[in-house]
Regions:
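A short hydrophobic/aromatic micro-motif that marks alpha-helical segments and, especially, helix-coil
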Residues: 60-62, 75, 194
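A short helix-loop-beta-strand connector motif used in the catalytic cores of GNAT acetyltransferases and
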Residues: 70-84
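Conserved GNAT-fold acetyl-CoA-binding loop/helix
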Residues: 49-70
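Short, conserved alpha-helical segments within structured domains
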Residues: 59-60, 81, 152
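Sparse recognition of residues in long alpha-helices and their boundaries
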Residues: 55-56, 80, 176
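Acyl-donor (CoA/ACP) binding surface of acyl/acetyltransferases
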Residues: 2-38, 42-50, 86-198
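Hydrophobic residues in alpha-helical segments
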Residues: 43-44, 53, 75-76
Length: 198
């Protein structure tokens, strides 16, 4: 089997659920229903932000509460990892980051994130992504973390490169957005690479 020559043994993953994480400037915590107004204000209603990670827009409080039902309900499972992103000195949800895929059999998870337009170009996406990477390797025991971006999303490419991911390949015409096909660029980081960077 391809890759078996590496001979890397791995301990079992330990699911711990979504716990609060603090970085230098950010607070990552579970979503709550009272996040609805700042979510609407900062990102979920923004077509440009949502399109960059292939998500629909949510333009009413009722729609956002439906989304929050899904997010908050997910916290009942210990293998569900989704954080609301806040500035430490702020009271508004400025984005989100999650492991939207967890593969227990093969010991990997895949990250997605978004940051509201008004809070971009501040390094927040990189800071939150590095925190999620550390959580995956140190708390959950992942062997590999994956991430991707649309070929037309150059800011996400810069975030991914700053975090130290290794480019794996391009999935051609993976997304269909606004009447055209867009490639998906795929990256990963192995646990030994993560520990080398620490």
């Amino acid at each position: 089997m391809a890759g078996s020559e590496r001979g890397v043994k791995h301990n079992m993953m330990t699911h711990v659920g979504t716990m609060t994480v603090e970085t230098d400037r950010l607070l990552l915590r579970k979503f709550a229903y009272n996040d609805d107004e700042s979510m609407l204000k900062n990102w979920v209603a923004d077509e440009k932000v949502q399109a960059m990670y292939a998500e629909p827009t949510y333009t009413t409080k009722e729609a956002v509460r439906g989304l929050l039902d899904k997010y908050i309900g997910g916290y009942e499972s210990p293998n569900y990892y989704r954080w609301a992103i806040f500035e430490k000195d702020g009271a508004e949800c400025i984005g989100q980051i999650a492991y939207f895929l967890m593969d227990d059999k093969n010991h990997f998870g895949e990250i997605e994130y978004c940051i509201g337009e008004a809070f971009q170009r501040k390094g927040y996406a990189t800071e939150a992504t590095k925190a999620a990477i550390a959580y995956g390797f140190e708390q959950v025991g992942l062997h590999k973390v994956q991430i991707s971006h649309m070929s037309n999303n150059l800011p996400s490419r810069r975030v991914i490169e700053k975090c130290g991911f290794c480019y794996e390949g391009t999935q051609r015409d993976y997304f269909y957005v606004d009447g055209q096909y867009v490639d998906r660029l795929f990256y990963s980081m192995l646990e030994e690479e993560y520990h080398t960077m620490e």
